[in-house]
Design a protein with these regions (language model features):
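An amphipathic, aromatic/His-enriched active-site/gating alpha helix that lines ligand/cofactor pockets
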Residues: 58-85
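Short S/T/G/P-rich N-terminal loop/turn motif that feeds into the first structured element of a domain
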Residues: 1-34, 38-40, 44-50, 69, ...
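Short beta-strand-to-loop capping motifs
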Residues: 8-10, 54-59
């Protein structure tokens, strides 16, 4: 499976209901699992435009797009997602350059 960085920024609704955030994190993890992925790590972030993040694995980009839309549609966070490449994957990409 591929690795992804999914960053979350609270919406006004999300920050107004911040005490419910831990339950929403668990709900988001369940959404990822239900769509064939697995959250490997969760972090809250200081000093960033983002508030929290997941490092996750997923079968493909389409699955991640579904995850982002499902989580974002709840109205508590906005998301920014990036594909991550392991050192081995990065090496494979570099070795394939012409």
């Amino acid at each position: 499976m591929a690795s992804y960085l999914m960053q979350f920024s609270f919406t006004a609704q999300g920050i107004q209901q911040i005490k419910d955030s831990p339950a929403r994190v668990e709900a988001a993890k369940q959404t990822v699992r239900a769509m064939g992925g697995e959250v490997r790590e969760f972090y809250a972030i200081l000093g960033s435009a983002h508030d929290t993040l997941f490092i996750l694995e997923a079968p493909d980009d389409a699955a991640v797009a579904r995850m982002v839309l499902a989580i974002g549609s709840r109205g508590y966070v906005r998301t920014e997602t990036h594909r991550l490449f392991t050192e081995e994957e990065y090496g494979t990409v570099i070795r394939s350059l012409p």
